Amino acid sequence: MRLMKKEKSMKQIILTGDRPTGRLHVGHYVGSLKERVRLQNSGKFDEIYIMIADAQALTDNADNPEKVRQNVLQVALDYLAVGIDPAKAHIFIQSMVPELTELSFYYMNLVTVSRLQRNPTVKAEIQQKNFESSIPVGFFTYPISQAADITAFKATTVPAGEDQRPRSEEHTSELQSPFYLVCR
């Protein structure tokens, strides 16, 4: 796991999370959960936000929203089981924060289709999911939603796996836009 970090600010804030498309498993523990618990207990962060990204999960599970809904509670319980402490970390459900959707909408006016098409992670996931030319708009634009999540919480640290690196770097670039600077 690699930590994608923005410039140092007054408050040190972590934003991380998971899509509730099933139970978390050993791969999640080794890949991110163990590190989250370590960061939570490090004392280096003023605020820690752990998002259950149900809205993002719908971008490629729109045909089965019940699967997503049923796993929200399970993911929260899995967080508690591995040692995420609600006294130290804020666990929240993405769809319960409507401002994230609103901010995503504004950001969609700043990012071009060609920029999204060039994102190597998005390209790989489109191929992996066999979307071909029938790419759902929500799926195609979810990197914009992720940028909104990051900026809304003013996250300084976004723990991300190597597969997220191109997207995290793109978010960092997007966050330097005049719109972001005005909205801070």
Question: Language-model features: where?
Answer:
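Short, conserved active-site loops that position catalytic residues or coordinate cofactors/metal ions
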Residues: 47-59
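Short, glycine/charge-rich beta-strand/loop segments that flank catalytic centers
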Residues: 87-101, 120-129
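Glycine-rich loop at the start of a catalytic domain that most often binds anionic cofactors/ligands
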Residues: 58-76, 102-108
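Active-site cores that bind ATP or allylic diphosphates and position pyrophosphate for catalysis
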Residues: 123-175, 184
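Acidic, His- and aromatic-enriched active-site or binding-groove loops in soluble protein domains
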Residues: 111-122
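Aromatic (phenylalanine/tyrosine) cluster motif
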Residues: 179-180
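Non-catalytic terminal extensions that flank enzyme cores
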Residues: 1-21, 40-46, 77, 86-89, ...
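Histidine-anchored nucleotide/phosphate-binding helix
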Residues: 26-50
